[in-house]
């Protein structure tokens, strides 16, 4: 009887121990799945419209006006009339409806001797009203290489222009001798939009 009692007690203790043990299951961590974007013809861009908007294009051109004499005078008209830069006038501008020149650097490169005298005056005409220089305040010395930068606001570059119309003009006039003085090197940045 005693032996049987011990067995009953042992079984009861084992049963209680089994009931007290927590059940632990090892599970793999669940990672949230990212939805892959499907690229297809029927997908719309974020703008909400059914087509992709084309942003404006930026172009840079460098051209020169050579064989300037000390007494040369003339003008450079920026736009479709810019014959000094065929890639712009006969190229890019014919491929778009609108353009905007945003930056201009006019550099004078001297070729004159150190004993030469005189200067070349220049003037910005943002409204294309003048054909000859009106003011000679701003000038380059014939014997010194210099450059001048014009801001976007100064060159009428805050609005878009039709590619059939010019934007602005730079006039110049020298007061030196009729000898080769140097050349102009012009760098411009042009925005275009609305391709033809």
Curated annotation (Swiss-Prot):
First-listed, main subcellular location of the protein, grouped into a coarse class: virion
Record flagged with keyword Magnesium: no
Feature: compositional bias, Basic residues: 32-44
InterPro entries xrefs: Luteo_coat, Viral_coat
Pfam entry (one): Luteo_coat
Annotated keywords: Capsid protein, T=3 icosahedral capsid protein, Virion
Annotated region described as Disordered, given as residue ranges: 27-55
Family matches, as Gene3D superfamilies: 2.60.120.20
Compartments, record wording: Virion
GO molecular function, one term: structural molecule activity
Note: The N-terminal region like those of many plant virus capsid proteins is highly basic. It has been suggested that these regions may be involved in protein-RNA interaction.
Role summary: Major capsid protein.
Family statement: Belongs to the luteoviruses capsid protein family.
Protein name: Major capsid protein
Species of provenance: Bean leafroll virus (BLRV)
